[in-house]
Amino acid sequence: MLNNFLNLELLNISLSYPFLFLITTAIVLLLCSGFWKFHRSFYIGISSLSLIVSAFLILNNANAQGLEAKAFLATLNNDIVSFYASLVILCFSFLYLLMQKEENQGEFYALFLFMIASLLLMVSSSNLALIFIGLESSSLALYTLIAMRGSDNAISSAIKYFSVAAVGAGFFVMAVAFIYLKTGTLDLSANLALKNEFQKDPMLLGAGVMIFVLCAIKLSLAPFHFWLKDVYYAAHTNLVAFISVVPKVAMLVVVIRLFDFLNNTGFEYIIIVLAIFSMLIGAFAALSQNNIKKMFAYSSVVHSSLVLVACIPLLKEQNFDGILLAIFGYWTLFAFAN
């Protein structure tokens, strides 16, 4: 194992260049803001350029190694799911920066790049430990961004979001412990070979349900959506548009990998009930709102439920490529509409 880890060819470090470059740029911006004062156009320009370079590195990796490459002992993947999700994340992050016309603090842009790098790490891995690291790193940055911009209630809404997500993170960690206890691995793709054992083991099925609790919180599915209305109302409008798309695309990748793991276990019945319940709650709650941002919050609940319904066939191994095309196609159109 140690020899494999020291083998640079097996490590395939180039797959990590896109998010390592963003992290390096974020550190540079953080240092610049600490010693000099620049206009926001400088921070926006550097941040936008770093996103473009990161997208180029992803395309270059896909061209040079294909969409089956792995890195760091197969903990990082360059599959079609991570490839498309990474480009969507970078594209709409770039559009968000173009809308940025008020923020002059370099710390804001450094945190933003840290968050995007963490999201890229999350979508590029099927290893539960790396997924959790990417998820929590991006979430901590997002909580801070929400608190930095918006109304007087932005800090309290960020704390509420943090509190709800912390509960979900606890479920996630407990589920990871159960999965490792039963399988001896943290790799969701490796666990696909254990489907027969998984179908008979209530501990592993329960672990899958606990992981999905965190996914439901991040996707703002009812009844885990209580944080969303306050965040949408208090956060800056541009940031609301960003929150409604980019973090959810990253979490959608985790759901896709999780559903592969939960294949043919009967888990789809739980998802169907949750999706229908979430649609109804979001639709009826939106009708009673007198604030447009709060109405959009419940609209986001409904959209997440629709995407969740599209993911259900993944639990039955039916036309995987067609399902992914429909899911990402819908979410991309929704993002442009936003």
Where are these regions (language model features)?
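Alpha-helical transmembrane segments of multi-pass membrane proteins predominantly involved
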Residues: 1-338
